[in-house]
Amino acid sequence: METRDLQFFIKALASGSLSRASEELGYSVSAGSHILERLEKQLGVKLLTRSPRGIALTEAGESLIPEIHALLAQEEKLDVAALEAAAWETRFAVTADAQA
């Protein structure tokens, strides 16, 4: 499961449309549809129902939203921690070289 797939799902919910979410994220509508299908297959549940009027959450999709948000938030924390660790390494290396 890829982060971008989860982000697409959340964007589709926010926009109320797979085509709108695809456009906002720079995907073709076909690619957006494939992303959702792949995510549903990986999770083993149908997340959304589609109709000419838009999309609607399934019960399974609704139950997974808190976990998806938590996972995306945790990944963001990891990214920040990694950047901070890299910055610390750079500062340490510069200080060590300056004392030599």
Named regions from a protein language model:
Residues 40-57:
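A short LG(V/I)-centered, amphipathic sequence patch enriched
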Residues 28-31, 35-38:
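Residues within the DNA-recognition helix of helix-turn-helix
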Residues 42-43, 64-86:
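Alpha-helical linker/hinge and terminal dimerization helices associated
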Residues 11-26:
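Short helix-boundary/capping micro-motifs
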Residues 17-18, 36, 50:
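Helix-turn-helix DNA-binding elements, focusing on the entry/boundary residues of the two helices
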Residues 23-24, 41, 62:
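Alpha-helical residues within the helix-turn-helix
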Residues 1-15, 33, 62-65, 69:
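Short alpha-helical elements of helix-turn-helix
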Residues 82-100:
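Interdomain hinge and pocket-entrance segments immediately C-terminal to HTH DNA-binding domains
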